[in-house]
Amino acid sequence: MANEVIKCKAAVAWEAGKPLSIEEIEVAPPKAHEVRIKIIATAVCHTDAYTLSGADPEGCFPVILGHEGAGIVESVGEGVTKLKAGDTVIPLYIPQCGECKFCLNPKTNLCQKIRVTQGKGLMPDGTSRFTCKGKTILHYMGTSTFSEYTVVADISVAKIDPLAPLDKVCLLGCGISTGYGAAVNTAKLEPGSVCAVFGLGGVGLAVIMGCKVAGASRIIGVDINKDKFARAKEFGATECINPQDFSKPIQEVLIEMTDGGVDYSFECIGNVKVMRAALEACHKGWGVSVVVGVAASGEEIATRPFQLVTGRTWKGTAFGGWKSVESVPKLVSEYMSKKIKVDEFVTHNLSFDEINKAFELMHSGKSIRTVVKI
């Protein structure tokens, strides 16, 4: 099959705002420096829903969504040297070419090698490997995991432990790695730190896990859905508060609770007003607030400059700061050695035909992560 077109099932998003449609598609063989992967499991993330809603300015249709997946290499194109058929892998939406100025700089993980074409839903050569009913179907985030087979650039693949359960470690392709890395890489919080985590979904829980691993003394969870508090405490939150229970702004509440403010705060929602509250909840002189949530296009953040002049820092993070190709295998190893949790994030398992139900569960707030077996 290596040099042949594969016919398989995929969940196609034909247009914005409509449910995904399970279709038979054709997946072309990998070209030079590309890898064709049989996807075994994928999760559904808020980013997929954001694009499907039509609000994403980079969203293009028709497209195969999905970026939290894991699978087995089916075949490789010419020039691929580090991967072979049969390898167990996680596709990566942030690649690591190892050669661009971003990859060569230890301060960032934002490889730009294929950014332009990836943003257009195309492979690095400017074309697609997917067709359905005679129409070209676009790629998504360089991964397109809502398909039995996908084709990705070889710099967008992490080779992982073949013993890892793919219906669990697929989550390391986005949300868990993002939150965990925000704490241990971006914030680099010290043991004994006091932290506040705004938004207790999957990413927020991963931040809590990272804070706990790093030795935080207090981890305060903040969410308007109190049903999320029990699970947050299981992950390591020492206390949880609901902003709706107070008559004053939540930053004032946190400043009072923590004798002047937290050492580190994390915004895991994508709400610019919450981003401001998270910054202003930080301690004068040294507090650091990390923006993890992705706000809608065109949104702007605001605060009084005095907040920054008096020693607070605003930072952002993407994929938790992990240089992807080299870091994801290590994260899988940390999971296998029980240093980090993954299983506990999975609240629902569905068949491929039920993929639209995964979006419904997410919008209802009833799931952390739903894993779809492909």
Curated annotation (Swiss-Prot):
Entry annotated with the keyword Metal-binding: yes
Compartments, as annotated in UniProt: Cytoplasm
GO terms assigned for molecular function: alcohol dehydrogenase (NAD+) activity; electron transfer activity; fatty acid binding; formaldehyde dehydrogenase (NAD+) activity; identical protein binding; S-(hydroxymethyl)glutathione dehydrogenase (NAD+) activity; S-(hydroxymethyl)glutathione dehydrogenase (NADP+) activity; S-(hydroxymethyl)glutathione dehydrogenase [NAD(P)+] activity
Annotated EC: 1.1.1.1, 1.1.1.-, 1.1.1.284
Keywords of the record: Acetylation, Cytoplasm, Disease variant, Dwarfism, Intellectual disability, Lipid metabolism, Metal-binding, NAD, Oxidoreductase, Phosphoprotein, Zinc
Residues annotated to bind Zn(2+) 1: C45, H67, C174
Keyword Zinc recorded: yes
Cofactor binding description: Binds 2 Zn(2+) ions per subunit.
PROSITE patterns: ADH_ZINC (PS00059)
Record GO cellular component, one term: extracellular exosome
Binding site for Zn(2+) 2: C97, C100, C103, C111
Site (Important for FDH activity and activation by fatty acids): residue numbering on this chain: R115
Residues modified to N6-succinyllysine: K233, K315
N-acetylalanine carried by residues: A2
Functional note: Catalyzes the oxidation of long-chain primary alcohols and the oxidation of S-(hydroxymethyl) glutathione. Also oxidizes long chain omega-hydroxy fatty acids, such as 20-HETE, producing both the intermediate aldehyde, 20-oxoarachidonate and the end product, a dicarboxylic acid, (5Z,8Z,11Z,14Z)-eicosatetraenedioate. Class-III ADH is remarkably ineffective in oxidizing ethanol. Required for clearance of cellular formaldehyde, a cytotoxic and carcinogenic metabolite that induces DNA damage.
Comment field (misc): There are 7 different ADH's isozymes in human: three belongs to class-I: alpha, beta, and gamma, one to class-II: pi, one to class-III: chi, one to class-IV: ADH7 and one to class-V: ADH6.
Subunit and interaction comment: Homodimer.
Family: Belongs to the zinc-containing alcohol dehydrogenase family. Class-III subfamily.
PANTHER family: ALCOHOL DEHYDROGENASE, ALCOHOL DEHYDROGENASE CLASS-3
Name under which the protein is recorded: Alcohol dehydrogenase class-3
Organism: Homo sapiens (Human)
